[in-house]
Amino acid sequence: MELQDLIIDDAVSIEQNTQENTITIKAGDSSKRLSDLIKDFPENCYINKQITGCGGTTLVLRNDVDYVVLVPYVNLLKSKVADNDHLDHINIIKRGGEWTDNDAEISEQLADRSKPRKIICTFDSLPALMKIKGFVPGEFKLLVDEAHTLVNLGSFKAPKCEFILHNYNKFASYVFLTATPTKREYFPDLIGHLPLCTIEWDNVRAVKFNLQRLDKGVSINNALFNLCLSFLLGREEGNAHIFYNSVKEITQVMEWLSKIVGTDGKDRKSVV
């Protein structure tokens, strides 16, 4: 489908710059869902949708195109199934998580062409899906959701991520979708040539991230403690939202803070 044929809302525009290898979708109001703006994503590109909750996977799961939607986690698979399994106008096919021993069922569903076929599959389950009788990749468009995880998970799920990267071009067309894209220079080599498609929204507030480099010998816990303390004591304005992927280390920092600030937020002793 030509780029301009994808547009539903007349306020939307799509521009392609072949020299820079980019596509720009000017989507307008960020409160609108993508399914109200475009019919489908452009083919064969890496898409930065920039915001979450705009209905990227909903768009492809509810349109009239046969799709395989790859998700990195079982919980995401369950969520997509729960949101769409009740719809009568599409045929939802599941592979991964609790839906692993269902080759015969999938083969039967694949044979039903009366409505669009939508396969939701985990990264881990793609190799098994490719072997199922009746599954022909060339009959489907592929969406790799949370595409940045191909880099993030690559260190400990390398075979699964590599399988996707070596097989995505067996599909009729493909889209790599994320709201938090990997920097272009760090793209895996096998998708580094793809056009970068950016969805621009009119009324999105820019979020500023302040990078803090740690001096040699300074632990993450010490740095985090000092950062939290600065906010709690009013030295830094605003709110701090922190993600730290360790319950043990979070507990230690909280214990340190409680000795100085207290669990009620009041200073227990002065800090120099």
Name these PLM-found stretches.
Residues 56-97, 183, 246-251:
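Conserved Walker A/P-loop ATP-binding site and its immediately adjacent core
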Residues 271:
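Conserved small/polar residues in nucleotide/adenosyl-binding loops
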Residues 42-61:
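Walker A/P-loop
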Residues 66-77, 120-122, 230-260:
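Conserved strand-helix element at the start of the C-terminal RecA-like helicase core
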Residues 181-231:
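Interdomain hinge/linker at the junction between the two RecA-like core domains of SF2 helicases
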Residues 9-42:
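Pre-Walker A adenine-sensing motif
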Residues 124, 134-166, 173:
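SF2 helicase catalytic motif II
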Residues 87-131:
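Inter-Walker segment of RecA-like/P-loop motor cores
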